[in-house]
UniProtKB/Swiss-Prot annotation:
It is a peripheral membrane protein. One of its GO terms (cellular component) is plasma membrane. One of its GO terms (molecular function) is proton-transporting ATPase activity, rotational mechanism. The gene is atpF. Keywords: ATP synthesis, Cell membrane, Hydrogen ion transport, Ion transport, Membrane, Transport. Its main location: membrane. This is A-type ATP synthase subunit F. Component of the A-type ATP synthase that produces ATP from ADP in the presence of a proton gradient across the membrane. It comes from Pyrococcus abyssi (strain GE5 / Orsay). GO terms for biological process: proton motive force-driven plasma membrane ATP synthesis. Has multiple subunits with at least A(3), B(3), C, D, E, F, H, I and proteolipid K(x). Belongs to the V-ATPase F subunit family. It is found in: Cell membrane. InterPro entries: ATPase_V1-cplx_f_g_su, ATPase_V1-cplx_fsu_bac/arc, ATPase_V1_fsu_sf.
């Protein structure tokens, strides 16, 4: 199963260097957001994609993300950090894996 990343240029470049299978860059123009929606729909329908990493800001602009079991769609912070804040991320991790993250 492939790991795919979608996001801004800096985030995508970092994941390319880390060895993700496929990476797609988008800016925040209306045309680019529409392309991102179409690419996400295409990726969700593919059988070879296991994880889609998408920056929080791009996911927010796209709107409703598909609710599917596979591939797993994970929202990740970009170079500016999380738009949801640290507390919400802790809560999400606690619910997902049952472990609370503390500093």
């Amino acid at each position: 199963m492939k790991v795919v990343v979608m996001g801004d240029s800096d985030t995508v470049t970092g994941f390319r260097l880390a060895g993700v299978h496929e990476a797609y860059e988008f800016d925040f123009s209306e045309l680019s957001i529409e392309r991102a929606r179409n690419k996400l729909k295409e990726l969700v329908e593919r059988d070879d994609v296991g994880i889609i990493l998408i920056t929080e800001r791009l996911a927010q602009r796209i709107g409703d993300l598909p609710q599917v079991n596979l591939p797993i769609i994970l929202q990740i912070p970009d170079k500016f950090g999380s738009i949801y804040g640290e507390e919400l991320l802790r809560e999400i991790v606690r619910k997902a894996v049952g472990i609370e993250i503390k500093r």
